[in-house]
């Protein structure tokens, strides 16, 4: 049994769980990143990328000092160099534990979230709260050229980096696809997503790139590690000067996850949400 499998044996994901009635930071379940990174040749002490895991939580509520419910949408930014990610069902259960908990101030909610999530992840986690009608939550479109209308024949549905091809021309461009699909490593549930690739380097052949992205269709892994797998393969096969890979996964259980990884200095487009999130 792998180290990851040993860890996931005790995770709430895939198990029946009682929903908490009282605040409980102990519900958060960290998963060390290194166990999944080792097969990719990655070392936490010398990562070839920067990045974050951006989460949105749409089912966040608490009580004010008088017992009146307050609702909000939360955005969390978990750094890619944190020792651990946080298992999604445990995160959901933790947020549900706020439902009947009283807070005097909105800032107290943020302080509590930042403290507890940092403790679980082993690094600072940025927290922002939005009103449910905030314009920042409106869906937007991914920048760049969409690959999805290319006429390609597909043979592979597990990650196949050998599909990637590059030309001799050096370009700087942004490409995206909405055909990304991977699967939860615990439950096997499908994880649907969109992926953006921004780079400067030898021109990626579009047909080959789309075939490669589709090859994740039967792959089982966490969202965060799928993005790291994409990054590692693209760096190895295309050797770009600069690279950003960002996936925006469809919401499940009131949470969506949008990891990005980039070469030093790269940053994703302005925070955005897609229609499927």
UniProtKB/Swiss-Prot annotation:
Active site feature: 184 (thioimide intermediate), 191 (proton donor)
Alphabetic keyword roster: Cytoplasm, NADP, Oxidoreductase, Queuosine biosynthesis
GO molecular function term, any single one: preQ1 synthase activity
Main location: cytoplasm
Pfam families, per database record: QueF, QueF_N
GO cellular component, one term: cytoplasm
Binding-site residues for NADPH, renumbered to this chain: 88-89, 252-253
GO BP term, example: queuosine biosynthetic process
Cellular compartments annotated: Cytoplasm
Protein family (similarity comment): Belongs to the GTP cyclohydrolase I family. QueF type 2 subfamily.
Subunit structure: Homodimer.
Name of this protein: NADPH-dependent 7-cyano-7-deazaguanine reductase
Organism taxonomic ancestry: Bacteria, Pseudomonadati, Pseudomonadota, Gammaproteobacteria, Oceanospirillales
């Amino acid at each position: 049994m792998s180290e990851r499998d040993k860890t996931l044996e005790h995770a709430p994901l895939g198990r029946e769980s009682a929903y908490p009635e009282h605040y409980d930071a102990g519900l958060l379940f960290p998963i060390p990143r290194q166990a999944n990174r080792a097969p990719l040749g990655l070392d936490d002490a010398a990562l070839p990328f920067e990045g974050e895991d951006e989460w949105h939580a749409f089912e966040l509520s608490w009580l004010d000092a008088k017992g009146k419910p307050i609702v909000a949408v939360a955005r969390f930014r978990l750094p890619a160099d944190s020792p651990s990610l946080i298992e999604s069902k445990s995160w959901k259960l933790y947020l549900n534990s706020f439902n009947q908990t009283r807070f005097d101030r909105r800032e107290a909610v943020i302080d509590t979230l930042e403290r507890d999530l940092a403790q679980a992840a082993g690094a600072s986690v940025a927290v922002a709260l939005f009103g449910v009608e905030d314009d920042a939550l409106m869906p937007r479109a991914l920048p760049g050229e969409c690959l999805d209308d290319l006429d390609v024949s597909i043979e592979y549905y597990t990650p196949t980096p050998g599909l990637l091809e590059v030309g001799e021309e050096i370009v700087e461009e942004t490409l995206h696809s909405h055909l990304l699909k991977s699967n939860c490593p615990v439950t096997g549930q499908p994880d649907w997503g969109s992926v953006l690739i921004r780079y400067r380097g030898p021109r990626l052949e579009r047909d080959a790139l789309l075939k490669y992205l589709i090859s994740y269709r039967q792959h089982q892994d966490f969202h965060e590690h799928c993005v790291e797998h994409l990054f590692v393969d693209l760096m190895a096969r295309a050797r770009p000067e600069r690279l950003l890979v960002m996936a925006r996964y469809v919401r499940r259980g009131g949470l969506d996850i949008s990891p990005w990884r980039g070469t030093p200095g790269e940053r994703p487009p302005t925070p955005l949400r897609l229609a499927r999130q």
